[in-house]
Regions:
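C-terminal cap/substrate-recognition subdomain and adjoining C-terminal extension
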Residues: 36, 40-41, 47-168
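A metal-dependent, Asp-based hydrolase signature
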Residues: 1-60, 64
Length: 168
């Protein structure tokens, strides 16, 4: 059969319009800053604080999928910078996250790469990866705690709500 993909995600309990605007506003504050500075700040933040936030169940779930031979991707509304660290920690081979435009001098333009990896935008990135892997989303699992991920939950064949927000 087609390869299955396990997707793990965290973050965000606010409504789509509010969080999309917040993400874009946050990215704009980076205008002109070197991407290399962000890479270093996020690495430090991950090591000092964020790494400890990973729930043990996340690692166990990912390990089960890896042992079954599944492709594992981290699908997150976080930035690719932070998401990449979590993906590496979990052993995920793909990171689907918000990306920021960088100019030819290595500085942020203040614009996100669209669509944002949030709400319906997550479906876009999940479908694109599934297509690249020759997989069908109906063969994929997706783990989330957020109501904002309902569009992805509705598209995958194996949706899993983990410590769900009350709206799930």
């Amino acid at each position: 059969g087609a390869a299955r993909a396990a997707y793990w995600t965290f973050l965000y309990e606010l409504g789509f319009a509010r969080i999309e605007r917040a993400i874009e506003d946050g990215i704009r504050t980076l205008t002109g800053q070197p991407e290399s500075d962000m890479v270093e700040r996020v690495r430090s933040f991950f090591e000092e604080e964020a790494r400890a936030l990973l729930r043990p169940g996340a690692e166990r779930a990912v390990q089960r999928h890896l042992q079954a031979g599944d492709q594992v991707a981290l699908l997150t509304s976080s930035s690719c910078y932070l998401g990449g660290h979590f993906a590496d920690l979990l052993g995920a081979s793909h990171t689907l996250a918000n990306r920021f435009e960088v100019d030819d001098r290595g500085r942020f333009t203040g614009e996100p790469v669209k669509p944002l990896c949030y709400g319906p935008g997550k479906v876009h990135y999940a479908q694109r990866l599934a297509d690249e892997l020759g997989a069908d989303l109906s063969d994929c699992a997706f783990y989330t705690d957020s109501y904002a991920d309902v569009p992805v939950l509705e598209r995958v064949g194996h949706p899993v709500a983990v410590h769900p927000d009350p709206r799930l």
